[in-house]
A protein has these predicted regions:
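Flexible, compositionally biased loop and terminal segments
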Residues: 1-140
Length: 140
């Protein structure tokens, strides 16, 4: 379990609960469940740029070493692979400020169902649709 987003606006009790949950599952193998709370990708990117700038000013990193991999390490999802699939409920064809950097080569499946009504059969359908895709990772 990984909570992504600006946690500073939550109560200390809730922040501590998030930390406890992340700690209790950090050594597990397999998939990571990202729970986005107070998350906005533009904010995430601005925060990453500020933190990189601070580390450049302090001499921790050299400007010449800034690349996509280093930048990714400053995001909330540092250390995780980019998502293969994002399921977009509600039938909306928009990204809604969600994982703008990480979703560069992600496949999207748009489901015409609201999130509260989403069922296992919908997940199965989305995975089936995804499994039939020919992923090109930006290629033609």
């Amino acid at each position: 379990v990984k909570f992504i987003g600006d946690k500073s606006h939550f109560s200390l009790d809730l922040q501590n609960l998030m930390i406890e949950n992340e700690e209790s599952s950090k050594d597990r193998d397999g998939m990571v469940l990202n729970i986005a709370m107070n998350y906005g990708s533009r904010d995430e990117i601005v925060r990453a740029v500020k933190n990189i700038s601070t580390d450049v000013k302090s001499g921790k990193i050299d400007v010449e070493n800034i690349d996509e991999a280093l930048f990714s390490n400053y995001l909330y999802t540092a250390g995780q692979p980019d998502p293969d699939l994002i399921i977009r409920p509600s039938g909306e064809y928009r990204i809604s400020n969600f994982m703008l950097w990480q979703a560069a080569y992600t496949e999207f499946v748009i489901m015409n169902k609201l999130w509260p009504d989403f069922e296992k059969s919908d997940l199965d359908e989305a995975i089936n649709i995804y499994s039939q895709r020919n992923r090109r990772f930006g290629g033609v």
